[in-house]
């Protein structure tokens, strides 16, 4: 039952809607929102405190609305991480990659426009579309959650979207998106029509790389394609591998033209001076912030192998291929809500998300994963027998 008074003039299309959000519960083992479970090192915390202390006397003034120093830090980091050096005017920061995505929908969506995704996909995308009055269409992935590129190309030709939005690694499945698939879709976007737009206007391709630091070593990033493809935008975040979710910092890598479009719709002074200072401090310690990524990859691979050894109703569990810090598993859970509830009773919070029959768990500390494994073995037997 909604708590919103009926006499408030809420938009008609929002009546009955609920705020988005994964459960935030005080439980011993939180494995539901794909955070890095390891806290920042003390040296990182000290540098954050130092940077914030330095700018504190200036908080009576608005921050640098173009956040030039931070955009340079994005450039330096991507040059190391992806091997591609971008100019400052090819980068843009925001309060988490959620705000980046909303800005893209504000700039390139709107009434009469359509965005195209591929399901299963991140559950916030249709909400960005709703909030910007943008149409939302889907091309369906293969049974193993890999992208069906032919279906995407057919949908681009049919729908004539202004944006094509794909996630690599995909959320909630973790499925990597091969570079050759990205390049095929880019080629289609560079000649496709956009419904309601003039001649010579073509859709942009947005690749959401929120989890890309967890990819297998040696796998290239879509950032490497930006210099040759002005219709490509790549979204990144510091919330996942960078262990910086509480700071809410995301960023966009794209051509100057796309960045300038986003700048039109951004709120003035949208990144606070405190946020900018904290992010700069984190980049000073990038190696420390990312030091646990390899261990989390190893945890993912070990957990995937273990899950495949488990059974539910005499069938082995399925595990989707993952290049992220989480695993989608199960495949045939006929009572996934019951499994979720029983795990929660044992202090383990995971996520009911994705297609029916599946659950998602993100990688925690070694101790947290041991608790998860022990609880899951017990819970599967209980739910089977119920």
Curated annotation (Swiss-Prot):
N6-(pyridoxal phosphate)lysine: residues bearing it: 240
E.C. no: 2.6.1.9
CDD domains: AAT_like
GO function term, MF aspect, one: pyridoxal phosphate binding
Pathway: Amino-acid biosynthesis; L-histidine biosynthesis; L-histidine from 5-phospho-alpha-D-ribose 1-diphosphate: step 7/9
Gene Ontology biological-process annotations: L-histidine biosynthetic process
Cofactor(s) demanded: pyridoxal 5'-phosphate
Reaction(s) this enzyme catalyzes, per UniProt: L-histidinol phosphate + 2-oxoglutarate = 3-(imidazol-4-yl)-2-oxopropyl phosphate + L-glutamate
PROSITE patterns: AA_TRANSFER_CLASS_2
Keywords: Amino-acid biosynthesis, Aminotransferase, Histidine biosynthesis, Pyridoxal phosphate, Transferase
Pfam families: Aminotran_1_2
Gene3D superfamilies given in the database record: Aspartate Aminotransferase, domain 1, Type I PLP-dependent aspartate aminotransferase-like (Major domain)
S-S bonds: none
Self-association state and partner proteins as the record states: Homodimer.
Record family assignment: Belongs to the class-II pyridoxal-phosphate-dependent aminotransferase family. Histidinol-phosphate aminotransferase subfamily.
Protein name: Histidinol-phosphate aminotransferase
Organism: Bifidobacterium longum (strain NCC 2705)
Gene of this entry: hisC
């Amino acid at each position: 039952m909604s708590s919103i008074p009926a006499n408030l003039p809420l938009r008609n299309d929002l009546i009955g809607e609920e705020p988005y959000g994964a459960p935030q519960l005080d439980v011993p083992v939180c494995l539901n929102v794909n955070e890095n479970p390891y806290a920042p090192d003390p040296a990182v915390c000290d540098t954050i405190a130092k940077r914030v202390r330095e700018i504190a006397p200036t908080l009576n003034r608005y921050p640098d609305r173009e956040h030039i120093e931070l955009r340079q830090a994005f450039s330096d980091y991507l040059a190391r991480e992806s091997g591609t050096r971008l100019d400052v005017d090819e980068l843009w920061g925001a309060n988490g990659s959620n705000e980046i995505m909303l800005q893209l929908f504000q700039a390139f969506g709107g009434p009469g426009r359509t965005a195209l995704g591929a399901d299963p996909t991140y559950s916030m995308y249709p909400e960005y579309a709703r909030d910007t009055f943008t149409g939302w269409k889907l091309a369906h992935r293969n049974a193993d959650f890999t992208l069906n590129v032919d279906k995407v190309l057919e949908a681009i030709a049919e729908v004539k979207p202004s944006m094509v939005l794909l996630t690599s690694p995909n959320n909630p499945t973790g499925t990597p998106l091969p570079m050759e698939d990205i390049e095929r879709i880019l080629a289609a976007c560079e000649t496709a029509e956009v419904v309601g737009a003039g001649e010579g206007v073509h859709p942009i391709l947005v690749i959401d790389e929120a989890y890309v630091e967890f990819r297998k070593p040696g796998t290239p990033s879509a950032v490497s394609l930006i210099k040759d493809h002005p219709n490509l935008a790549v979204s990144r975040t510091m919330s996942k591998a960078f262990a910086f979710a509480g700071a809410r910092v995301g960023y966009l890598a794209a051509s100057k033209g796309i960045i300038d479009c986003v700048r039109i719709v951004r709120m003035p002074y949208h990144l606070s001076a405190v946020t900018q200072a904290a992010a700069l401090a984190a980049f000073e310690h990038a190696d420390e912030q990312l030091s646990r990524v390899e261990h989390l990859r190893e945890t993912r691979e070990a957990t995937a192998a273990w899950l495949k050894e488990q059974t539910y109703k005499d069938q082995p569990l399925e595990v989707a291929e993952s290049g992220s810090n989480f695993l989608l598993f199960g495949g045939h859970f006929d009572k996934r809500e019951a499994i979720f509830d029983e795990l929660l009773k044992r202090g383990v919070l995971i996520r009911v998300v994705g297609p029916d029959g599946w659950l998602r768990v993100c990688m925690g500390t070694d101790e947290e994963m041991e608790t998860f494994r022990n609880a899951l073995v017990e819970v599967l037997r209980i739910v089977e027998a119920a």
